């Protein structure tokens, strides 16, 4: 056992007591209040990764809550499920958190899936909303939508 592992094991009860009964939303809200202007997400500003765009904790929370408001208007409710098909971008992270703010469960689907595979997974998870990162993915999910029992909306980010 490494020294780090031993140390973490010795701190287990302290760590557990500090997070017990709290949710992800509790911690996002705390960070947005206590660390409002600190970076929460960093995204490459160019393909060479020589510059980065940052989004602060308060901007991240506000963007997720704004998306959640729209998702609720589309019918997403606590206990529902939604999926995201997108590159690993800040919009993907905002979408994931926005779904959580609705009280729904997010899932990420591989971008390489074709419409029949999307249909299968969407029906299996009873997805109510799909969030996609580009027009090509929108078209693929839209083909699957007609045979998806619960899928009510596709959101293009």
Spans of model-derived segments:
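Alpha-helical packing segments of well-folded alpha/beta enzyme cores
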Residues: 24-31, 63-67
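Structural motif detector for alpha-helix initiation sites
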Residues: 24, 56-57, 115
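AMP-dependent adenylate-forming
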Residues: 28-55
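Conserved AMP-binding/adenylate-forming
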Residues: 50-55, 68-113, 123
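Flexible, non-catalytic linker and terminal segments flanking ANL/adenylate-forming cores
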Residues: 1-28, 44
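Structural core segment of the AMP-binding/adenylate-forming
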Residues: 101-157
């Amino acid at each position: 056992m490494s020294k780090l592992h031993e140390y973490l094991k010795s701190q287990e009860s302290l760590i557990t007591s500090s997070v017990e009964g709290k949710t992800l939303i509790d911690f996002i809200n705390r960070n947005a209040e206590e660390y409002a202007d600190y970076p929460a997400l960093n995204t490459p500003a160019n393909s060479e990764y020589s510059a980065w765009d940052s989004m602060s904790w308060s901007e991240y929370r506000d963007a997720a809550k704004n998306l959640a408001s729209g998702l609720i208007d589309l019918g997403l409710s606590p206990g529902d499920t939604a999926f995201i098909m997108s590159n690993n971008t800040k919009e993907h992270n905002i979408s994931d958190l926005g779904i959580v703010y609705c009280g729904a469960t997010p899932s990420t689907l591989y971008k390489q899936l074709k419409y029949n595979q999307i249909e299968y997974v969407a029906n299996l998870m009873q997805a109510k909303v799909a969030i996609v990162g580009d027009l090509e993915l929108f078209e693929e999910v839209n083909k699957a939508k007609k045979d998806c029992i619960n899928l009510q909306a596709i959101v293009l980010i």
